Swiss-Prot record:
Native source species: Arabidopsis thaliana
Family: Belongs to the TRAFAC class YlqF/YawG GTPase family. MTG1 subfamily.
Pfam family, one: MMR_HSR1
GO molecular function: GTP binding; hydrolase activity
Sequence motif: DARXP motif, positions: 55-59
Protein name: DAR GTPase 2, mitochondrial
Organelle transit peptide: 1-21
Keywords: GTP-binding, Hydrolase, Mitochondrion, Nucleotide-binding, Transit peptide
Classification of source organism: Eukaryota, Viridiplantae, Streptophyta, Embryophyta, Tracheophyta
Length: 377
């Protein structure tokens, strides 16, 4: 969110989210969320650890505000930065270093990577051992996973449960919590065993937002990363925000090799079309196929590199984005139709590629912002 243009787009999106949060019929803070707040508040004093799951791309905006009500926190707190595979590695390291310098326990994880989850499990087990050395007398250790919607609590709970049970060579039916790309699917608190000798359980909880949201920039980041339902703002606006961030960054320069030689590009295209024509015909509309993703990266690189306008200027940035949408219709195999509907299809596909890490790694806020906001920890 570094440039003035990005902020203008973010402000429009953020204001829409704030307006929705004040709507009496708002969807993300329904009766189930109010009930979850009560249930979680009652259990926090009873658990041994609180694992606050945050989105590594927005370590500030994905803060779990409910924890501010507990000062000091009765349980040992660990900040887990999930979705590390989607964040800028350098910025992520700065964030981890920031927490460590201030003696805050933190850990970065990719909940879909088995080795990464194993390392987190080992870290958690070491914390359990430290707890027992300090005089914890119980035979069971409990860890409550807390966080806003769609930061990956359920995916992480499942991974810890599966790997923990396998590591302990335990038999029996594995449990599963509901995992979805849509925020708000988890409605109840669920207990999953992740270790034995001593027994260790994680409690997966529903994602919780405050009843009202007030900061437009934070709301825009939450919307872009998928913590808030897309239809509140619209995928078209969100995709434009992402393209603004991409166009203002250096991430696209990593794709230069895709365009080093036009002859090479054409040769690869011809070879691909000959050797894999049947494959392409079958999956031509699947934008997640590698050959389509490469084409998307190439088009984005070419359009940004060829642009000679001022990216700090709102009108110029808008013109570049319009050029990119027009070029992307072809590589994303969007049928010829009314421009508005075609752009909606392009936006949906681009947004998905961004959120799955196919279009680079982005951290939307930096350590300087953390330093201003986390004195209460």
């Amino acid at each position: 969110m570094a440039t003035a243009k990005t902020w203008k787009i973010a402000r429009e999106i953020g204001d829409a989210v704030i307006k929705a949060s004040r709507n009496p019929n708002r969807r993300w803070y329904g009766p189930h969320m109010a009930a979850a707040v009560r249930a979680i508040s009652e259990r926090i004093p009873l658990v041994d650890f609180v694992l606050e799951i945050r989105d590594a791309r927005i370590p500030l905006s994905s803060e779990y505000e409910l924890l501010r009500k507990f000062s000091p926190l009765p349980s040992k707190r660990i900040i887990v930065l999930n979705k590390m595979e989607l964040a800028d590695p350098l910025e992520l390291k700065k964030c981890i270093d920031y927490f460590e310098e201030r003696n805050y326990l933190s850990y970065a994880v990719n909940s879909h990577n088995k080795d990464c989850v194993k390392q987190l499990l080992n870290f958690l087990q070491s914390q359990v051992r430290e707890l027992h050395k300090a005089g914890h007398s119980g035979h069971t250790t409990t860890m409550m996973l807390l966080g806003i919607p769609n930061v990956g609590k359920s995916a992480l709970s499942n991974s810890l449960h599966h790997i923990g049970r396998i590591s302990a060579a335990e038999k029996g039916k594995l449990k599963h919590t509901t995992v979805s790309s849509q925020p708000g699917d988890t409605k109840d608190i669920m207990s999953l065993k992740i270790g034995s000798h001593p027994n260790v359980y994680v409690l997966d909880t529903p994602g919780i937002f405050p009843p009202n949201l007030y900061d437009a920039e934070i709301c825009a980041k939450l919307a872009l990363t998928g913590a808030i339902p897309d239809d509140i703002v619209g995928e078209l606006k969100l995709a434009r925000l992402f393209l603004t961030i991409l166009n203002s960054s250096h991430e696209y320069k990593k794709w230069a090799k895709l365009c080093k030689s036009q002859d090479l590009t054409e040769s690869l295209s011809d070879e691909s079309s000959k050797s894999d024509a049947k494959h392409k015909r079958q999956y031509a509309t699947d934008h997640t196929q590698d050959f389509i993703v490469y084409d998307v990266r190439r088009v984005l690189y070419e359009t940004i590199s060829a642009f000679d306008g001022n990216l700090e200027d709102e009108i110029s940035m808008g013109n570049l984005i319009e050029t990119q949408f027009a070029a992307l219709r072809s590589v994303l195999r969007v049928p010829e139709e009314a421009s508005e509907f075609a752009d909606l299809r392009v936006a949906s596909k681009i947004l998905n590629l961004y959120r799955t890490g196919r279009l680079g790694h982005y951290t939307l806020e930096h350590v300087s912002a953390l330093a201003k906001s986390y004195t209460y920890l």
